[in-house]
Amino acid sequence: MTRPQAILTDIEGTTSSISFVKDVLFPYARRAMPAYVREHGNHPQVRHWLNQVADEIGEDVPDDVLITTLQTWIDEDRKHTALKALQGLIWGEGYKIADFTAHMYADAALQLQAWHAAGIPLYVYSSGSVPAQKLFFAHSDAGDLSGLVSDWFDTEVGSKREAASYRRIAERIGVPASEILFLSDVIEELDAAKRTGMRTALLERREDYPTPRSADDVGSHQRVENFSQLVF
């Protein structure tokens, strides 16, 4: 593989384990949601996102109903922007009081640092909100890695399974899509990125995917088990 001009990476299942997100972050946000909404519900930023949830429901509903809706969305792993924003705010409180640190695979931390040192700009695109992404990298168990990242993208730029989202990102960072390498563990996301001309690599970590995906599903995407196998 030739050296890309920029690298765009997912987080969950790519730089970090799926189990940390599913077993630590999601349950933490679910448990904390009622108290957080009741305590901070009048804060303009929090109320903005709660209003978006109410708009989605299509009713003028009390906060208790919004809380139940948000907890249901967490159970369903909904990629709703308002949910992701509120989760990020709650996780911010958790990081602040050191309830947990964010999991980062050692190979990912080392390779991101090496690419940054080599002058390759790094970008993050995750369904989690941009503030949550920044907190994740700032409070990782490999230390503060947030300074390695040039810019961050979430679902406000569009769905991760739509090619238009990747075109917008390429335009935002000012690099031709063909010179951007996108890293993800989700084949549908890689398919969308490839339709724009981006280079792609599927992360298939044995910790997250004990059974390899079929060659037919993987298609033309490069398949690697960790970041150290990405050589250019």
Swiss-Prot record:
Q: What does the Swiss-Prot or TrEMBL cofactor note state?
A: Binds 1 Mg(2+) ion per subunit.
Q: What class of enzyme is it?
A: hydrolase
Pathway assignment reads: Amino-acid biosynthesis; L-methionine biosynthesis via salvage pathway; L-methionine from S-methyl-5-thio-alpha-D-ribose 1-phosphate: step 3/6; Amino-acid biosynthesis; L-methionine biosynthesis via salvage pathway; L-methionine from S-methyl-5-thio-alpha-D-ribose 1-phosphate: step 4/6
Keywords, A to Z, come to:
Amino-acid biosynthesis, Hydrolase, Magnesium, Metal-binding, Methionine biosynthesis
Q: Which reaction does it catalyse?
A: 5-methylsulfanyl-2,3-dioxopentyl phosphate + H2O = 1,2-dihydroxy-5-(methylsulfanyl)pent-1-en-3-one + phosphate
Any one of the GO BP annotations: L-methionine salvage from methylthioadenosine
InterPro entries the UniProt entry points to = Enolase-ppase_E1, HAD-like_sf, HAD-SF_hydro_IA, HAD_sf
Query: What cofactor is needed?
Result: Mg(2+)
Extract the SUPFAM superfamilies matched here.
HAD-like
Task: Mention one GO molecular function.
Answer: acireductone synthase activity
* Membership in a protein family: Belongs to the HAD-like hydrolase superfamily. MasA/MtnC family.
Subunit structure, interactors included? Monomer.
Q: Which PANTHER family match?
A: ENOLASE-PHOSPHATASE E1 (PTHR20371:SF1)
Role:
Bifunctional enzyme that catalyzes the enolization of 2,3-diketo-5-methylthiopentyl-1-phosphate (DK-MTP-1-P) into the intermediate 2-hydroxy-3-keto-5-methylthiopentenyl-1-phosphate (HK-MTPenyl-1-P), which is then dephosphorylated to form the acireductone 1,2-dihydroxy-3-keto-5-methylthiopentene (DHK-MTPene).
HAMAP family found in the cross-reference section: Salvage_MtnC (MF_01681)
Q: Under what name is this protein listed?
A: Enolase-phosphatase E1
User: Which gene is annotated as encoding this protein in its UniProt record?
Assistant: mtnC1
